[in-house]
């Protein structure tokens, strides 16, 4: 692996750990040239289905799009990076488990909402407002009321 600091080819692994419930390997590396240290994350690359967008276009699944959408909803919220990564892994595993070659973006959106509801209710409402295209305050109220009812049912 190339050093991100000096671009030398030779690096050594200083430490390796399983993270995200064993779905990733976190490695601390050290450059043998400049001796800078950096972290890498390793995950198995698996074929994901195409995403069918609302307008009918088909695009490859990009985990970075999933992550950035969730990060936007979670901005300035007390959710750890580890919890976010676990949620992303849960979503991608569910998508893969379905075994379909194509999956509707609405299905992905519902999976994201399920994970955000579990992680942080404010982030859930933020995401829902964009995903469900809220038109006015009544849409927010309706979503919050639904959340309250779900919380009562769980109690």
Swiss-Prot record:
Question: Molecular function terms in GO for this entry?
Answer: ATP binding; DNA binding; zinc ion binding
Q: Which UniProt keywords apply?
A: ATP-binding, DNA-binding, Metal-binding, Nucleotide-binding, Repressor, Transcription, Transcription regulation, Zinc, Zinc-finger
Q: Name one GO biological process term.
A: negative regulation of DNA-templated transcription
Q: Which residues cross the membrane?
A: none
The note describing how and how many cofactors are bound reads:
Binds 1 zinc ion.
Q: Which cofactor does it need?
A: Zn(2+)
- Which residues does the UniProt record annotate as the domain ATP-cone? 49-139
Q: What is this protein called?
A: Transcriptional repressor NrdR
State the function annotated in the UniProt record: Negatively regulates transcription of bacterial ribonucleotide reductase nrd genes and operons by binding to NrdR-boxes.
- Keyword check for Hydrolase, yes or no: no
Q: Which family does it belong to?
A: Belongs to the NrdR family.
The zinc fingers classed as unnamed run over: 3-34
């Amino acid at each position: 692996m190339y050093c991100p600091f000096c671009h030398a080819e030779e690096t050594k692994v200083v430490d390796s750990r399983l993270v995200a419930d064993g779905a990733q390997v976190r490695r601390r590396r050290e450059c043998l040239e400049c001796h800078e240290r950096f972290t890498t994350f390793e995950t198995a690359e698996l074929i994901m289905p195409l995403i069918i967008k609302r307008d009918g276009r088909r695009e490859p699944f990009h985990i970075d799009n999933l992550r950035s959408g969730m990060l936007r909803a979670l901005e300035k919220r007390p959710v750890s990076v580890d919890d976010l990564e676990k949620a992303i892994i849960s979503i991608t595993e569910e998508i893969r488990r379905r075994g379909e070659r194509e999956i509707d973006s609405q299905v992905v959106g519902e999976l994201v909402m399920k994970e955000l509801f579990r992680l942080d209710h404010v982030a859930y409402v933020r995401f829902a407002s964009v995903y469900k295209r809220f038109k006015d305050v009544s849409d927010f109220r309706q979503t919050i009321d639904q959340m309250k009812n779900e919380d009562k049912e769980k109690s």
